[in-house]
UniProtKB/Swiss-Prot annotation:
Keyword match Lipid biosynthesis: yes
Subunit comment: Homodimer.
Family from the record: Belongs to the thiolase-like superfamily. FabH family.
Name the record gives this protein: Beta-ketoacyl-[acyl-carrier-protein] synthase III
Pathway involvement of the protein, from the record: Lipid metabolism; fatty acid biosynthesis
Domain topic, free-text comment: The last Arg residue of the ACP-binding site is essential for the weak association between ACP/AcpP and FabH.
Entry's Gene Ontology molecular function annotations: 3-oxoacyl-[acyl-carrier-protein] synthase activity; beta-ketoacyl-acyl-carrier-protein synthase III activity
Keywords: Acyltransferase, Cytoplasm, Fatty acid biosynthesis, Fatty acid metabolism, Lipid biosynthesis, Lipid metabolism, Multifunctional enzyme, Transferase
Taxonomic source organism: Streptococcus pyogenes serotype M6 (strain ATCC BAA-946 / MGAS10394)
Keyword Lipid metabolism: yes
Length: 324
């Protein structure tokens, strides 16, 4: 049988740094108010780089690190809710920029679960035997979706990209997965709604910026995500002691605190970087993974079991346990 493995990781963030104190100068907030509620102190904001620019930086790094030729890449999946345009896809721009002429490329929209969903799909593509090498990138410029007068949401989000190179392997590395969607709760977190504008339409007011029911999302993350992780471990006969690190979507420090208690895993196993990047949606998990590899916490030698878990708009949530 053929399986997939993560062979390379990379990330990139824009240079512009915006601190909580910077935000306090343009809206009614403070560093203390933001940090005490979220664990976020600063975030990176793009000045002129589009989502594709961030993703291209990651793709270039992955190619350089791997030593592969661009035409050896079979597919590119970009998980994003902030594409450059609805057409062409962000992934198509990445494919062109790195000259991966043999690769098919497409975007996936699953909000903050996007990277996990895309990685699960990429694993199946390689397991089919038809493809050998693929890139999965989470990339966001959420700053263009934020209402900068709304302190409830503007303080949360940042821009960035992270990704992995997947290669075919004889050994199984994706050990377990669970993916979920509950569209009935979709109005809890929305952004980028468009208006009907044909000569025949009655019309509908667009909701361009991010709008969130914070309490509903907080409760959803603690209840549904914790339950799905516990079910996943039980079904796969993987215990909490088998897990070396937990890399969850970087939305809020208090969410991580509560999930750690719910699933009874030591809090120190939960890596985090939201303090420096904020919530980067589909990019948060791969950025966290890339930094953990840089720091030597995760070795990419196939000896560690890592829980990856995303949750967000849709509502969507999903987890993978991977041997890395």
């Amino acid at each position: 049988m053929i399986f997939s493995k993560i062979s390379q990781v990379a990330h990139y963030v824009p240079q512009q740094l915006v601190t909580n104190n910077d935000l306090a100068s343009i809206m009614d907030t403070s560093h203390e108010w933001i940090f005490s509620r979220t664990g976020i102190a600063e975030r990176h904001i793009s000045r002129d780089e589009m989502t594709s620019d961030l993703a291209i930086q990651v793709a270039d790094q992955l190619l350089t690190q791997s030593g592969l030729k661009a035409n050896a890449i079979d597919f590119i999946i970009v998980a994003t809710i902030s594409p450059d345009a609805t057409m062409p896809s962000t992934a198509a721009k990445v494919q062109a920029a790195i000259a991966a002429t043999s690769a098919f490329a497409f975007d996936m929209t699953a909000a903050c679960s996007g990277f996990v969903f895309a990685l699960a799909m990429a694993d199946k593509l390689i397991a089919s035997g038809a493809y050998q090498n693929g890139m999965v990138i989470g990339a966001e410029t959420l700053s263009k979706l934020v209402n900068w007068q709304d302190r409830a949401t503007a303080v949360l989000f940042g821009d960035g990209a992270g990704g992995v190179l997947l290669e075919a392997s004889k050994d199984k590395h994706v050990l377990a997965e669970t993916l979920h969607t509950d569209g009935a709760r979709c109005q809890s977190l929305i952004s980028g709604e468009t208006s009907l504008s044909s000569p025949y339409s009655i019309g509908k007011k667009a909701i361009a910026t991010i709008q969130m029911d914070g309490r509903a999302i907080f409760d959803f993350a603690i209840r549904d995500v914790s339950k799905s992780i516990l079910t996943l471990m039980a079904q796969s006969d993987i215990t909490k002691d088998d897990i070396d690190y937990c890399l969850l979507h970087q939305a809020n420090r208090r969410i991580l605190d509560k999930i750690a208690r719910k699933i009874d895993v030591p809090r120190e196993k939960f890596l985090e970087n939201m303090m420096r990047y904020g919530n980067t949606s589909a990019a948060s998990i791969p950025i966290l993974l890339s930094e953990a590899v840089q720091k030597g916490q995760i070795r990419l030698d196939g000896t560690q079991k890592i829980l990856l878990s995303g949750f967000g708009g849709g509502l969507t949530w999903g987890s993978l346990i991977v041997k890395i």
